[in-house]
Amino acid sequence: MPVITLPDGSQRQFDRAVSPMDVALDIGPGLAKATIAGRVNGELVDASDLIENDAQLSIITAKDAEGIEIIRHSCAHLLGHAIKQLWPNTKMAIGPVIDNGFYYDVDLDHTLTQEDIDALEKRMHELAETNYDVIKKNVSWHEARETFVKRGENYKVSILDENISHDDKPGLYHHEEYVDMCRGPHVPNMRFCHHFKLMKIAGAYWRGDSNNKMLQRIYGTAWADKKALNAYLVRLEEAAKRDHRKIGKQLDLYHMQEEAPGMVFWHNDGWTIFRELETFVRSKLKEYQYQEVKGPFMMDRVLWEKTGHWDNYKDAMFTTSSENREYCIKPMNCPGHVQIFNQGLKSYRDLPLRMAEFGSCHRNEPSGALHGLMRVRGFTQDDAHIFCTEGQVRDEVNACIRMVYDMYSTFGFEKIVVKLSTRPEKRIGSDETWDRAEADLAVALEENNIPFEYQLGEGAFYGPKIEFTLYDCLDRAWQCGTVQLDFSLPQRLSASYVGEDNERQIPVMIHRAILGSIERFIGILTEEFAGFFPTWLAPVQVVVMNITDSQADYVKELTQKLQNAGIRVKADLRNEKIGFKIREHTLRRVPYMLVCGDKEVESGKVAVRTRRGKDLGSLDVNEVIEKLRLEIRSRSLQQLEV
């Protein structure tokens, strides 16, 4: 007679084993109709799974994040159902949930076209609209294998042979005549799976191994209702308009080419943005009392063997040879910073020592994963490492957190999700050390009133970490900032200081990045601002233009005055209509356009327009310059009412 405890603390007693659906029905028919699955003692289960003992139960509906994820997973099965009806010889591989959707890898004897995808989506809708029940059966490993052997599903057989224990009872989900295998849970009925869209096709190797067959990956998105689906599609459309690759070309910021895959060719305007970001970061380094250093971009392989990078990371490292020595081009900056720390005897009085670098790093990312500025092989990190005593960790982490929020707020990022990753099973250091380290990170977050969630067991083997994920205006997540404790690297590279007891001590090392890759951060900002960079970041901040040749000297004089005030300015003296010039510079997202006609020459003023089309009228030149300098100096996100 199980007693079921609900989230509000109320209890219901039953005289038999019950499923989450039974409990929902006992509460009311409305809840039963909305039930997708259950969470029993913290574990997600199907709505039909039986609960035999006392348990805590939460009913999962489409209002829950888990409910949406289950809908997406079931839409992957729906895709399988439809594709087997259209092309019965298709072999099904894997169909997991991903952010905002799902995919299915399929082995098909022809290359899918857009017409095929349209037909597939249509068949999926036809099937879903019959609102058939999804039937789950847990069977023996042997029965599952026999089922898929009979159906010719060699990829499912391979999964059973290589990934599932013979003692397990795999879940087989029956979608009418179609059968799929999954841990689940899945929707109990296809009425939950009406709001989806197939998005694109890509290639994917079976098990991610290029030695295996290339499969076709069909991507889709699915939501709880039509409104949410349409809102997502609108966001995608907006994201396409904001694509940094498209805007980067339009604004002549950078380019990439085949001869240097994953490496950026910065053009003048893009490099201006890059240098402005460096200047901004440097101002914060000074404020938070960091040294700035510069390490070599390659070091002997022997050093990387000492650090452990060679054993764990060599596939991602570029190497070169000279005079019978092998060198690794650095994928990260930390070993170099330890070498700088090791020069000269250090005392506890020298700590904390905060060391920052705009470190040029290279990683051998797979060519298929490269994506504009977001995923590159050559990048610059705003990297820092803090060497401190165990007793200083909390204060240093506290300062790092303040610095992270200080810098992100400058760009207008307000929604930041924070996760604290704790000790994994395989780790170095004592439990006492980990207890203190994890507590230091948690307390530092709490002292800054920052809500966070734990990622249990997700820390590195050498220490716990805090991850900062910022959300942009389209609610996309970008993991940028990290504060990572490291108990290993200083020990591996013999870093030490003399403690108060005159004994040799090993410092704690804190890895700290805020923007992460500057290249990637510029990509994020380009999409966040849709190319309308705040004035302080804009490559060209002001364009001064004449209406006729008679104002040319006045334009030159005004341009020089703006340059002398430290403003990035260009003069446009072309023999073109003023409307043409304004349109062109508006498309180039120049924050301010100053127009000079005869009236402005006579009055010593200038007509001011913003890139958003706002006419601010004819204003005193010195007032305009002072207001612009204030806007730039304060790194304002808003254009001032000059």
Curated annotation (Swiss-Prot):
Cofactor, free-text remark: Binds 1 zinc ion per subunit.
Main location: cytoplasm
EC number: 6.1.1.3
Residue ranges occupied by any TGS domain in the UniProt entry: 1-61
Cofactor(s) in the UniProt record: Zn(2+)
Catalytic reactions on record: tRNA(Thr) + L-threonine + ATP = L-threonyl-tRNA(Thr) + AMP + diphosphate + H(+)
CDD domains: TGS_ThrRS, ThrRS_anticodon, ThrRS_core
Binding-site residues for Zn(2+), renumbered to this chain: C334, H385, H511
Spans annotated as Catalytic: 243-534
Listed GO MF terms: ATP binding; metal ion binding; threonine-tRNA ligase activity; tRNA binding
Disulfide-bond pairs as recorded: none
One family name in Pfam for this protein: tRNA_SAD
Top EC category: ligase
GO biological process, one term: threonyl-tRNA aminoacylation
Keywords from the UniProt entry: Aminoacyl-tRNA synthetase, ATP-binding, Cytoplasm, Ligase, Metal-binding, Nucleotide-binding, Protein biosynthesis, RNA-binding, tRNA-binding, Zinc
Function of the protein: Catalyzes the attachment of threonine to tRNA(Thr) in a two-step reaction: L-threonine is first activated by ATP to form Thr-AMP and then transferred to the acceptor end of tRNA(Thr). Also edits incorrectly charged L-seryl-tRNA(Thr).
PANTHER family assigned: THREONINE--TRNA LIGASE, CHLOROPLASTIC_MITOCHONDRIAL 2 (PTHR11451:SF44), THREONINE-TRNA LIGASE (PTHR11451)
Family in the record: Belongs to the class-II aminoacyl-tRNA synthetase family.
Assembly behavior: Homodimer.
The protein's name in its UniProt record: Threonine--tRNA ligase
Lineage: Bacteria, Pseudomonadati, Pseudomonadota, Gammaproteobacteria, Enterobacterales
